[in-house]
């Protein structure tokens, strides 16, 4: 049976992906992968009803049980074993690798005792991100994943984009923050940090707090990728210091008020500043819908056409773009840059503004 990644598509080709022969081949491959990972729970028929405090009839140690793994409810490896129906009577023996946990780097921990050496993290780092921060190494004749000289991720040049976490099918790579939290809802959102506007899926726990960020795989903007700010820099939404009630300054002191009182005060102040001598300036990170409402409010309520947004874009550049392209912004997808022979970057810090 030829592998799909090595056989070119031909006219009239009939592709069967669910035949008994294909499934049996998949099971044989998975048997080898299972031997690289704690498998007492993976091949047990009670896995769906077994709790963390239940007595294991297979005598699986606490550290090797699926219910104590931080990736238990989002483990692609476990889902694949279920899909293939691999309830093995005598799975291949798993030998604990005795690899110390890597917890010294920011943002995420690495437990290579759970690694199945599938190579996904290495490939996404090299082929998609172009970083080469991690690769295959050897230890006592065993192939492992790690940095070139055993250095930390910071020393290896890692960008901490989190792409390796998103493709890891097991619990070898896991976020430090909210490691054990389970998602109860997923909310679609746009990253607010830069003009690229990456599509993100926000995992929310039962208390309504953001616990994890997963880039949207099917987004035409970022294609399942994010930068360190989009992946790990949205925790501010959970801050207890966020202002949740209106504040009105009285005697030079900000005091809490009701929404009705605050809106009435704003309306009374705005009536004093109407017409062409007034202007409305909106935040550049507002959504299209918010900006539309802002301009509508300016024209109808404030009776002015003086509308702008505060931005760090140099006017000379935007004027030139508008004259040349008819639009003061990019008119083509970001991914067209892959086809460019020459890229001119002017007065921009790509790490800050277009890191993805």
Model-derived regions, located:
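Ferredoxin-type iron-sulfur electron-transfer modules and their immediate structural context
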Residues: 1-161, 165-167, 171-174, 195-226, ...
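Catalytic alpha/large subunits of respiratory electron-transfer oxidoreductases
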Residues: 38, 61-63, 118, 123, ...
């Amino acid at each position: 049976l030829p592998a799909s990644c090595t056989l070119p598509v031909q006219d009239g080709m009939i592709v069967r992906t669910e035949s008994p022969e294909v499934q049996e081949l998949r099971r044989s491959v998975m048997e080898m992968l299972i031997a690289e990972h704690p498998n007492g729970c993976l091949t047990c028929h009670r896995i769906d009803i077994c709790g963390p405090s239940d007595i294991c009839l297979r005598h699986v140690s606490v550290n090797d049980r699926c219910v104590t793994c931080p990736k238990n409810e989002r483990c692609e490896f476990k889902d694949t074993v279920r899909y293939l129906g691999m309830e093995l009577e005598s799975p291949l023996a798993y030998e604990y690798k005795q690899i110390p946990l890597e917890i010294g780097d920011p943002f995420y921990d690495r437990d290579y005792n759970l690694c199945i050496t599938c190579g996904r993290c290495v490939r996404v780092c090299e082929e998609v991100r172009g970083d080469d921060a991690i690769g295959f190494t050897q230890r006592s004749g065993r192939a492992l994943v790690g940095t070139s000289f055993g250095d930390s991720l910071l020393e290896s040049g890692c960008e901490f984009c989190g792409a390796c976490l998103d493709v890891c099918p097991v619990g070898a790579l896991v976020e430090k923050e909210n490691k054990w939290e389970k998602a109860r809802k997923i909310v679609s959102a746009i990253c607010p940090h830069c003009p690229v506007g990456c599509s993100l899926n926000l995992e929310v726990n039962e208390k309504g707090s953001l616990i994890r960020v997963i880039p949207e795989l099917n987004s035409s903007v970022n294609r399942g990728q994010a930068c360190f700010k989009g992946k790990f820099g949205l925790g501010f939404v959970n801050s207890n210091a966020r202002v949740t009630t209106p504040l009105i300054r009285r005697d030079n002191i900000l005091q809490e008020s009701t929404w009705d009182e605050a809106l009435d005060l704003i309306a009374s102040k705005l009536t004093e500043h109407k017409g062409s001598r007034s202007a409305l300036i909106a935040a550049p990170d507002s959504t299209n819908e918010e900006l539309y409402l802002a301009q509508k409010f300016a024209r109808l309520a404030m009776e002015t056409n003086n509308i702008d947004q505060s931005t760090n874009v140099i006017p000379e550049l935007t004027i030139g773009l508008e004259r040349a392209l008819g639009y003061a912004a990019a008119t083509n997808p970001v991914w067209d840059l892959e086809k460019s022979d020459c890229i001119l970057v002017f007065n921009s810090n790509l790490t800050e503004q277009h890191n993805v």
